[in-house]
Design a protein with these regions (language model features):
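An N-terminally biased module of ancient metal coordination in phosphate/nucleic-acid-related enzymes
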Residues: 1-68, 73-77
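Active-site gating/metal-coordination segments in enzymes
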Residues: 61-62, 69-160
């Protein structure tokens, strides 16, 4: 009886934990993640090389890195990770990391144009949405321009 080789996994929602990415997150995060992960070491950042090593150890071949937009800009506790942070990881490790562009329904058409730019010029393959961070159901009209743009671009939206 022969055994098949292991099937490599794809992490479909992976955060980017570089020092640069963590600098964009709010101050409450360390307390929030305490006890859930190795917060003392991970909250200082994980290099992309270390992230790839951890992925290899877990049998993960590829990861979808998302650039979260969590809550309206300027509200306490909210944060937006610039697409450029994820784009640099995609450029450095093509074929290992793929990008998902976070959506903020309150950005309107400027957000739609930023999504299009991320897909057409930064190598992103889809969009990511946290509906609960915006207190809007996924079928709210504020999302329609983003949905239409994703259809036009032929990319999926991941809702979490």
């Amino acid at each position: 009886m022969s055994s098949a080789p292991p099937v490599p996994a794809i992490d479909i929602v992976s955060g980017i934990w570089t020092e640069e990415a963590l600098a964009h997150r709010p101050g409450w995060q360390e307390q929030f993640f305490a006890g859930k992960m190795k917060s003392k070491t991970n909250m200082k950042g994980v290099t992309l090389d270390d992230q790839l090593a951890l992925m290899a150890e877990a049998g993960i071949e590829r990861a979808l890195l998302f650039a979260p937009k969590a809550g309206r800009r300027g509200l306490p506790g909210s944060f937006h990770l610039p697409y450029e942070v994820v784009a640099r990881a995609l450029e450095k490790y093509p074929g290992r990391f793929y990008g998902l562009a976070g959506l903020d329904p309150y950005e309107g058409m400027s957000g739609v144009r930023a999504l299009e730019d991320a897909v057409k010029h930064m190598g992103f393959i889809g969009a990511h949405l946290y509906p609960h961070w915006f207190d809007l159901p996924p079928d709210h009209a504020k999302y329609y321009p983003f949905y239409a743009k994703c259809c036009e671009l032929g990319v999926p939206i991941q809702m979490q």
